[in-house]
Design a protein with these regions (language model features):
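His/Met- and acidic-residue-enriched segments that coordinate or traffic transition-metal cofactors
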Residues: 2-164
Length: 164
């Protein structure tokens, strides 16, 4: 009886050991998916509003998003490639819908863009904080830790613009 119980426990432990790398890959891939979709959205939405916004601070912020998130996106793509993870080919439906709303905005898109960037940066900061703390891939975890201060700075900038 004890031998049967021990054998069952050992089989379960071995099975869980083999299952763990798959769980890790899924978690890393999930981070890559969300980080890439968010990063692409921040660049593309910023490109759309340049010239459509009236507030110079918003325009300057949009340019910074193109530069900073463009660089972060390239670094993420490089790390993902090295780690054999895939970058999503396109954004999710919500981000696509937000881009369409910006494209079709009549007149100034300041308020819509600022709100979208507030939401995007709140999501990004949480995603990167969580992965920096509990990430399962050392390279991606380091990327999250290195990128987080910039995301927090962006979040502070957009909150200041929104309140001003």
């Amino acid at each position: 009886m004890k031998l049967r119980l021990l054998s069952g426990a050992l089989c379960t432990a071995v099975a869980l050991g083999f299952a763990h790398p798959a769980l890790s890959a899924e978690k890393a891939q999930d981070f890559v998916n969300k980080a890439a979709e968010g990063g692409i959205f921040e660049v593309e939405s910023s490109k759309i509003v340049q010239g459509k916004v009236k507030d110079q601070a918003v325009n300057d912020f949009a340019q910074k998003m193109i530069t900073d998130h463009g660089a972060a996106n390239a670094k993420l793509q490089s790390i993902a490639g090295e780690q054999k993870l895939e970058i999503p080919a396109e954004m999710d439906a919500m981000h696509k819908s937000d881009l369409e709303a910006l494209k079709s905005a009549n007149g100034s898109a300041d308020q819509s863009y600022v709100k979208m960037q507030q939401d995007a940066h709140a999501d990004a900061v949480k995603l990167f904080q969580d992965y920096a703390a509990d990430g399962d891939n050392a390279e991606l975890k380091a990327f999250a830790q290195q990128t987080l201060p910039t995301l927090k700075m962006h979040q502070e900038m957009i909150e200041k613009i929104a309140s001003g």
